[in-house]
């Protein structure tokens, strides 16, 4: 990989880790930025290197479930980005049966962290939770569609420097009597007709988790044309 010295680059998107160059079709890794700022123009002096891996694939490679968060709120701009990403998710017949509740109040996050005995407690330390709901009256594939939207939140979070973790709610129990859905429904005043698929805990990670190596991936579960024929890389 070779580095290039580039100045006065028109930028369409800037994140904490990556930039996209207007007129180009390649994503780059940022090395040095901001040389000077004028009233109507920002001059960037960058050393950049081209990446062989497409940005979307790189995001998937890096994404890990994050359960420990820094005590820092997620900026409104980033919350807007997450919501837009989820709203752009595909759905069966374009019916979009999802509804999202953005939770930032610490007291509510603490209550939601008790939605089930295990696997949700870390939500109390997250600065942001997205309750992913679906309307069965709008689509019989609401489970699939809200699951796709849940993943959109997680991938978008990774791409803008946040970490996150899926908390399964549907078909889980708060205790021996009350379902996790019923528990959350009462706290957040969710109508009976609306189902709850998941909660996505989001925030800035305390520490990064190394990506899984390619050797760790379960390629033995991949087949070619027929179930008994293993797919060879």
Question: What is the predicted role of each segment?
Answer:
Residues 2, 7-18, 22, 36:
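Low-acidity, Ser/Thr- and Arg-rich intrinsically disordered low-complexity segments
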Residues 3, 31, 45-47:
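Low-complexity, intrinsically disordered or signal/transmembrane-proximal segments
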Residues 4-6, 18, 30, 63, ...:
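N-terminal low-hydrophobic presequence detector
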Residues 24-25, 31:
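A cross-taxon signal for low-complexity, glycine/charged-rich
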Residues 25, 36-37, 42-233:
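Acidic, surface-exposed loops and disordered segments
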């Amino acid at each position: 990989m070779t580095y290039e010295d580039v100045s006065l680059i028109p930028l369409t998107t800037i994140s904490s880790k990556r930039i996209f160059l207007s007129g180009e079709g390649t994503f780059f890794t940022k090395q040095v930025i901001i040389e000077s700022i004028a009233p109507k123009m920002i001059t960037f002096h960058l050393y950049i290197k081209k990446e062989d891996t497409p940005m979307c694939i790189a995001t998937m490679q890096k994404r890990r479930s994050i359960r420990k968060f820094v005590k820092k709120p997620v900026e409104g701009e980033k919350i807007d980005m997450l919501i837009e990403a989820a709203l752009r998710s595909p759905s069966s017949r374009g019916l979009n049966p999802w509804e999202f509740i953005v939770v930032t109040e610490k007291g509510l996050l603490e209550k939601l962290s008790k939605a089930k005995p295990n696997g949700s407690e870390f939500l109390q330390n997250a600065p942001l939770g997205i309750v992913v709901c679906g309307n069965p009256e709008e689509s019989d594939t609401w489970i699939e569609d809200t699951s796709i939207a849940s993943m959109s939140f997680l991938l978008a979070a990774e791409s803008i420097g946040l970490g996150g973790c899926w908390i399964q709610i549907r078909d889980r129990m708060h205790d021996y009597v009350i379902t996790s859905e019923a528990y959350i429904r009462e706290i957040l005043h969710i109508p009976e007709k609306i189902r709850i698929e998941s909660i996505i805990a989001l925030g800035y990670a305390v520490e990064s988790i190394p990506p899984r190596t390619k050797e760790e991936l379960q390629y033995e579960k991949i087949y070619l044309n027929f179930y008994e024929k293993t797919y060879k890389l």
